[in-house]
């Protein structure tokens, strides 16, 4: 009788090409996602060594990090334009399908992969981007890689990897009304720290996880890297199967049903043993707001910034408070914002936009605040416009943009000015992440929307229109 296995062990075993004890293992890669920032040097390496892309059919490229979200022809700088031109040239030369910024499949790479059905349970997926962990929501082993590894995968369709350990993040109970997947993952990182997942693949289990939609699960797995993990995983179930049915890149009819049955067998076996387990109680979690300069510097909205004297790392806390322009023991509800960004690979999908729109409908953005909504893909934008979400946001005073990474990172036209304070639905609040000197507070789409209306952070649960 075979030993019970976790989903990670099953996928790893299925993709093992070569292993030696004490050395990295060689894994086969099922899907390689490429964007314009981390790929130019990789393609140049292929040219210098006279190599081809081994499996262009298993490689898919898009433009997302640098794309302008207002005027597609207006670039922040020459480097951004050169990177996008290089990707177009490289994809043409090496025979790779590209969704450029005018293509109907264009979008943030971690939004369009699932949207197209490229992301599937049991696959190994890599991309030159740390938030590749997003795809783990489908029961895929997905992780970010560096530029030299991008070249290796392009050339060989394999990658050398040290085998991580397994960590069960067990979520007990259910989330309360107005508390979101974003709040859950922020609370997990705040409780256990930004390094507790180092050396592990984290699998999320429990009642709350099972009740989540696929888009909520993507938010959870997206931020696994912020806990230090190599990847995040959620075992596939009927929710996964229903989401992928009919997607462009999956089989149809009986072939899909056969494949779906195989996917469901990938779920972690009942008696499988993890290397470690942590637990968190969902019903104790409130809407969250980060106060500092990493995602672990996060507290409930009803709380305040920490006391420097009582902090475990007082120097770190003092520096973060100084950079953020905050004082110790300051109520989170007293923090005013001047920018609001709803977007990024964490929270730019249709369900995210629907929830934010429910908060702002019939209201107005506070005077002096610049608020923008940036859909995660061309298709998300199209679907949102079909149901009138664009008009809801624009009537409230939000800017309605084209798809792209946008204000998540200071790499394109959409930046927060020095000293500006942004309520952001993105995943990183490092110093200068949204622009030189910018101050970032990570929140859910609902919390960001409420901050835009009120001008400061509020407990979104006080809004009668909070979706259940």
UniProtKB/Swiss-Prot annotation:
Pfam family, one: Aconitase
Annotated [4Fe-4S] cluster binding sites: 345, 405, 408
Pathway: Amino-acid biosynthesis; L-leucine biosynthesis; L-leucine from 3-methyl-2-oxobutanoate: step 2/4
CDD domains: IPMI
Alphabetical keyword list: 4Fe-4S, Amino-acid biosynthesis, Branched-chain amino acid biosynthesis, Iron, Iron-sulfur, Leucine biosynthesis, Lyase, Metal-binding
GO biological process, one term: L-leucine biosynthetic process
Catalytic reactions on record: (2R,3S)-3-isopropylmalate = (2S)-2-isopropylmalate
SUPFAM superfamilies recorded: Aconitase iron-sulfur domain (SSF53732)
Annotated PROSITE patterns: ACONITASE_1, ACONITASE_2
Assigned EC number: 4.2.1.33
GO molecular function: 3-isopropylmalate dehydratase activity; 4 iron, 4 sulfur cluster binding; metal ion binding
Cofactor dependence: [4Fe-4S] cluster
Domain of life: Bacteria
InterPro entries named in the record: 3-IsopropMal_deHydase_lsu, Acnase/IPM_dHydase_lsu_aba_1/3, Acoase/IPM_deHydtase_lsu_aba, Aconitase_4Fe-4S_BS, Aconitase_4Fe-4S_dom, IPM_dehydratase_rel_enz, IPMI_cat
Cofactor details (free text): Binds 1 [4Fe-4S] cluster per subunit.
Broad EC category: lyase
Subunit structure: Heterodimer of LeuC and LeuD.
PANTHER family: 3-ISOPROPYLMALATE DEHYDRATASE, HOMOACONITASE, MITOCHONDRIAL-RELATED
UniProt record similarity statement: Belongs to the aconitase/IPM isomerase family. LeuC type 1 subfamily.
Its biological purpose: Catalyzes the isomerization between 2-isopropylmalate and 3-isopropylmalate, via the formation of 2-isopropylmaleate.
Full protein name: 3-isopropylmalate dehydratase large subunit
Phylogenetic lineage: Bacteria, Bacillati, Bacillota, Bacilli, Bacillales
Gene: leuC
